[in-house]
Amino acid sequence: MKTTIYLNDWFYNSGIVGFLRILDYNNDNFAEIKENYITFETNKLKNFHKYYFKYFFDKYNVGLRTKEKIEKSFEKIVNFLNDETLDNKEIKKIQENLKTEKKYVKDIIKKQLDKIKKYDDVTYTNILNEYNKIDKIKTKEDVDEINHIKEIITKEIQKDSINKRLTLNLFKSILSKNYFGQISFLNVVKNALTFEEQEKIMYKDYISNIIEIDFIDEILHDKYKIEELKILIKDKLDNQEISKEVIQIYTNIQKRFIDKEKSLDEIKDYIQKNVFAHCYMCENDKSLTSNYSEGNFIPLAVSSDNMKNFFWNQNAEFPICDVCKLILFCIPAGISSVKKTTKENVNGQVVHREKEVNGFVNYDTSVDDLLKMNNYLSQTSKVDKSIYNPYEELILNIVEQQKNLQEWQLENIFIVEFETEYLAFSRIEYFNIKRYIAKFFVEYSQNTLNIMKDYRYKIQIMDYILKNKDLKYIINSRLREELSKETQNGFNSFIATRIRLILNLLKKEDMEMDERVKKNNAKLSVLYNLGVSIHEELKAKKEDNKLDGYTYKMLNSIKSGNKKEFMDVVIRIHMSMGKDISPIFLEVMQDTDLDFESIGHSFISGLISNKFEKKDE
């Protein structure tokens, strides 16, 4: 039977992305991707439980991960042993590093040893014997011994029976803690079962009902006679690869109808009235359903049976079909793990800490766009995020790659970030792109943001834009940084000032906004170029050493909002050069569209630049 799955809420869409990723990883793309839905024959799901386990096994492969860590660590140990320095300080440092590295590799091995001890004494003993030899490694003559230890330990940990159990328990723990709790094979009581036995549990709990609906639908379409039906149902009941719900259905058909020699029409009537139910999530009327609860997705559900008082008339029923249940079970494969650096106040000190959160970008224009966008997020989230934020990088990529991008397309982007721990807490944050920001990206970013060459600065500006923070703080800070450099560069900060001006004007949503942006951009350019001109004249007179003092004073006056002090410095600069004050300052100070920060930052950006800088950029 063919089923169709349409784009829906963000968490359902993340399940669709996960479902497609699992199929793609297993080279069986049986689902057809249409504009806003996917479709496939449900009998193609017969091996999906194996695909699911393979996807997560390869993603969290403990044996491979441990092998790579051990090899890398032993390589460092060998390098320390082979170092032939004669300097006493260096020798002492090498010995300390060697001791640290040996402790590190022992901790890696010990972590797995403690788990292996519970279910394989022979493997545990083999690894433990080699583990105990690590501390005896002290000279370069022990290099061969190191290689032997490494070979034995990595070989033992990568044994199929060991690695499968270690990896299965790891990804079960992750899925249970962050997404589904203690349901199906994720329940800790199933840990004693083999990898293959737990695969079968998933088949029974998540796939068998979908397959059996095909068979039940065939009964409704008169594919079988009573005699054939009797044999088929008996085989299915004997096979025991079906869920308890379906066992009950087939038992009822067998005892109430077939054994009592009732007609096929009576069986069909029973199915229509008592078997099929309506799914509240996908609106499918031909399905077996179960109640939506925390076992379907912890961050957006509660234990319905235990919290009926929270529901109107204590009605906690929200039936969903088995196809939706399977799609939701694919959410972990559709979510990207994003590393973020957060600031925390610890005993009065600002401490930067790295943590992982779950991220998803909902973009419901099409399935293809949704998949591409989240695949890009997944790739960029693997980069060092102490510097870059994958969300900003994602939007930058969209803007730069899609020249004909429409505002509504950016407004449709909906970013979700969540952290969850089963039975502990759940935190979800959402943000989308405001209309004026979307207009900026579509109409103005090509000639502002995209021409900035300093990528880190660009990403910082993106972060401020998306979080609706005032760019004046980052511009002021950047200009101060430039003053401490040997080669100063103010052009990027001038572009940032233009971006800030445009955003402030776009917030007003004036009908003649384009003309106002153009007019005020021109004024900022005059201020920037005036600063460049003064820089060049002072440089020609060998008086450019005065610039830093002037600039710091002006930056301080901008930060404090002191226009009088700023203009005093401007006047002093002009007087020292024997020039009249440029009329542009009088004009812009009276302009209602231009704020003090934009005026000051544009002039300072030029003042610390030279006439070749823009060309170099």
Give the ranges of each region predicted by the language model.
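Basic, glycine-/proline-tolerant helical and adjacent loop/strand elements
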Residues: V189, L193-K382
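Domain-exit/linker segments immediately C-terminal to small folded modules
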Residues: A301-L483
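Long, contiguous all-alpha helical interaction modules
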Residues: M1-S208, Q406, L410-E617
